[in-house]
Curated annotation (Swiss-Prot):
<dbReference type="InterPro" id="IPR001352">
    <property type="entry name" value="RNase_HII/HIII"/>
</dbReference>
<dbReference type="GO" id="GO:0006298">
    <property type="term" value="P:mismatch repair"/>
</dbReference>
<dbReference type="GO" id="GO:0005737">
    <property type="term" value="C:cytoplasm"/>
</dbReference>
<comment type="function">
    <text>Endonuclease that specifically degrades the RNA of RNA-DNA hybrids.</text>
</comment>
<dbReference type="InterPro" id="IPR036397">
    <property type="entry name" value="RNaseH_sf"/>
</dbReference>
<dbReference type="InterPro" id="IPR012337">
    <property type="entry name" value="RNaseH-like_sf"/>
</dbReference>
<feature type="binding site">
    <location>
        <position position="115"/>
    </location>
    <ligand>
        <name>a divalent metal cation</name>
    </ligand>
</feature>
<dbReference type="GO" id="GO:0030145">
    <property type="term" value="F:manganese ion binding"/>
</dbReference>
<dbReference type="Pfam" id="PF01351">
    <property type="entry name" value="RNase_HII"/>
</dbReference>
<dbReference type="InterPro" id="IPR024567">
    <property type="entry name" value="RNase_HII/HIII_dom"/>
</dbReference>
<feature type="domain" description="RNase H type-2">
    <location>
        <begin position="16"/>
        <end position="207"/>
    </location>
</feature>
<dbReference type="GO" id="GO:0032299">
    <property type="term" value="C:ribonuclease H2 complex"/>
</dbReference>
<dbReference type="GO" id="GO:0003723">
    <property type="term" value="F:RNA binding"/>
</dbReference>
<dbReference type="GO" id="GO:0004523">
    <property type="term" value="F:RNA-DNA hybrid ribonuclease activity"/>
</dbReference>
<feature type="binding site">
    <location>
        <position position="22"/>
    </location>
    <ligand>
        <name>a divalent metal cation</name>
    </ligand>
</feature>
<keyword id="KW-0540">Nuclease</keyword>
<keyword id="KW-0963">Cytoplasm</keyword>
Length: 234
């Protein structure tokens, strides 16, 4: 988890500071879901070029990432790994990440705006769910960029551990290339076993393993000797 809190540039106490919250990586078959919360001082100049992270090029996201972390009064980035996703389910894992992200900036923010139509339970401050918020609210746009860049960087690091899957290119999404690699190599520890394509692959692996074991037993010397004894008895 990454966080920052700028104590030296807090505005006056009567300024309504709002945290923008968004996630990246709910849909991929591998890797974490990442949630970010960002708080800006509304009295300061805006960062030019903010937008929904999905509408920006990787280079543009990286450039804006640097501006956001430099200018934010506070930000928090939370990573929920694939094991937690499989344990909780992706929805609950995302809600957990959102709650932790808001908690990370609650000492600054008086409220939060969260992209989507659902709010996590037990938030430390009042919150509003904003459908399409990553295209409507600048703090949510900033949060979407922090979450996306953080996750993309992490997937590039995972590629170094698991080079067979191409995580550096598709970032864990179920592209044809990823599905082909999954079929050839099977899932790794970073794959989400609760997601249908991965679960199906694990089922196929288990079937093949049982078939191989059965075939091995049928051809083993012990099995052959046992069959000979049966034939003699006949």
């Amino acid at each position: 988890m990454v966080s920052q809190f700028d104590t030296q540039h807090l505005p006056s106490s009567n300024t309504a500071l709002v945290a923008g919250v968004d996630e990246a990586g709910r849909g991929p078959l591998a890797g974490p879901v990442v949630v970010a919360a960002v708080v800006f001082d509304p009295s300061q100049p805006r960062i030019n070029g903010l937008n929904d992270s999905k509408q920006l090029s990787p280079a543009c996201r990286e450039r804006l990432y640097a501006h956001i972390v430099e200018r934010a009064l506070a930000y928090k980035v939370v990573m929920i790994d694939s094991t937690q996703i499989d344990t909780l389910n992706i929805y609950q894992a995302t809600m957990l990440g959102m709650r932790l992200a808001v908690e990370g900036v609650a000492h600054v923010a008086k409220s939060a705006r969260i992209d989507g139509n659902r709010l996590p339970k037990n938030l430390p401050c009042p919150a509003e769910a904003l459908v399409g918020g990553d295209a409507r609210d600048r703090t949510i746009m900033a949060a979407s960029i922090l979450a996306k860049v953080t996750r993309d960087r992490h997937m590039v690091e995972l590629h170094l551990q698991y080079p067979h899957y191409g995580f550096d290119k598709h970032k864990g999404y179920g592209t044809p290339a990823h599905l082909a690699a999954l079929a050839e190599h099977g899932p790794c520890l970073e794959h989400r076993r609760s997601f249908a394509p991965v679960r199906k692959m694990l089922t196929l692996e288990a079937i093949h393993a049982r078939q191989s074991t059965h075939q091995h037993n049928e051809n083993s010397p012990t099995k052959a000797a046992f069959n000979m004894l049966l034939e003699r008895d006949d």
